[in-house]
Every structure is written in structure tokens, then in C-alpha cells.
Design a protein with these regions (language model features):
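Conserved NTP phosphate-binding and transfer environment spanning the P-loop NTPase/kinase superfamily
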Residues: 1-188
Length: 189
């Protein structure tokens, strides 16, 4: 569902996406290794207080007078093909994605606006000599609007588990994501 890389359009959008990160369980977390679970900002096993309060801290960082905020990027090195294999080669080739990120920070490459943020253009990401098919590249950079729409109720339930602690700004980002996805769904149909 998550593309290879995307850039948040705002600090709050980046914080929102950080708050809903999912990853496979590892030895650092209890449960079945390999099972998918929410791991906000990849900090759940290490955060000693309510995660929604932690998110509020990051929202507040963005409100500080004179704050020079970095861009926020979201990566998915582990997108799988229909056969269950990883599409992206990983390892040293991850530097190709980092190269695009650095160029975005410098304003040296363009991006495509999507409901979930900004994605690389086909010519902005160095894919030379990777041997990836056009279908594989399209899959890596595809925004699965239907998958995201199916995820929205799960995110709402997840946020509800934190009660009144969830920052209003993140609830607003969730609503904006919903509107953006609905607009795409309407345009495609």
C-alpha cells in the first residue's frame, strides 16, 4: 500500500504518517515475529509514555516560532510483488532513494502530488541498471487508493484507542487524507 518513498506536504502530514506507521514485529517487541502491527515513528517499544502525547510533542515542535523544520519522508523498502517477493533490491540501492530525498531537500528534482504526499517522477529517481520492469516500477510508485480507503477505518479505530490524547491536528490530517482519497476515487470512476 505504501509506495517506495513519499514526501510529506507539511509538518503535520509527516507527523500523521509517522503516527500510523506499521511494521513487522521484531525481537524488540512482544508478539509473533513478522506479524504486522502499528509502530508509530518506529518508537513503540522504546516510548515510556502515551504515544499520542508523544505525537503532540512533534505537532508542537512544528508550532515553535522561527522553527526551521526539515522535510519529512516516508519509505517502504519492503513492498512485495504478487509472488510475495520484494520488488525493491534494497541494500546499497537504497542510496538511490536517499539521493532523491537529498535532491528534493535542495529543490533539484520535481515531485508528483498525490493524496498521500509527493512522489518521485519517473525521471527523478535513478533506476538505471536495476533491471526493474515497467510494471515493477509502477508498483513501487503506485498509490493504492483503494487500499488506503480500506485502511481509514483501521486508523480511526487505532486513534480511538488513545482516547482524547490524539492531537486535533492529526485528526484533521486523517480527514484531509480521506477527502483526498475520495476525490481520486471519484475522478477514476
Amino acid at each position: 500500500m505504501v509506495p517506495l518513498v513519499n514526501e510529506a506536504t507539511s509538518w503535520n502530514q509527516g507527523t500523521f504518517f509517522g503516527s500510523i506507521v506499521s511494521s513487522e514485529k521484531t525481537a524488540a517487541a512482544s508478539g509473533t515475529i513478522g506479524e504486522l502491527r502499528r509502530d508509530p515513528m518506529a518508537m513503540l517499544p522504546f516510548c515510556g509514555y502515551n504515544m499520542a502525547d508523544y505525537w503532540q510533542h512533534w505537532v508542537d515542535v512544528g508550532k515553535r516560532d522561527g522553527a526551521r523544520l526539515p522535510k519529512i519522508f516516508y519509505v517502504n523498502w519492503f513492498r512485495k510483488n504478487e509472488q510475495g517477493g520484494f520488488i525493491w533490491p534494497g541494500f546499497g540501492d537504497n542510496s538511490r532513494v536517499l539521493d532523491w530525498i537529498f535532491k528534493r531537500c535542495d529543490g533539484a528534482v520535481e515531485a508528483v502530488e498525490t493524496p498521500i504526499g509527493l512522489l518521485p517522477t519517473l525521471d527523478g529517481l535513478n533506476l538505471d541498471q536495476l533491471g526493474l520492469s515497467e510494471d515493477a516500477i509502477a508498483s513501487l510508485l503506485r498509490v493504492d487508493a483503494d487500499g488506503w480507503m480500506a485502511e481509514l477505518p483501521l486508523i480511526e479505530d487505532y486513534y480511538a484507542s488513545f482516547g482524547e490524547h490524539v492531537p486535533e491536528e492529526l485528526k484533521e490530517e486523517l480527514e484531509e487524507l480521506k477527502r483526498n482519497l475520495e476525490a481520486v476515487t471519484v475522478n477514476v470512476a
